[in-house]
């Protein structure tokens, strides 16, 4: 079962956008990670 990640959760910048509940995985402005918008 696929659970979407909430806003602010770390996500894969290369993964499907559906991994985030918002449908958007964006780069964090400070940390070198991607987070759900």
Swiss-Prot record:
Pfam family name, one: Tryp_inh
SS bond partners: 4-21, 11-25, 20-36
Protein keywords: Disulfide bond, Knottin, Protease inhibitor, Serine protease inhibitor
InterPro entries per UniProt: Tryp_inh
Residues at the site labelled Reactive bond for trypsin: 32-33
Keyword Cell cycle: no
GO molecular function ontology, one term from the record: serine-type endopeptidase inhibitor activity
UniProt record similarity statement: Belongs to the Mirabilis serine proteinase inhibitor family.
Function: Trypsin inhibitor.
Domain characteristics, as noted in the entry: The presence of a 'disulfide through disulfide knot' structurally defines this protein as a knottin.
The protein's name in its UniProt record: Trypsin inhibitor 3
Source organism per UniProt: Spinacia oleracea (Spinach)
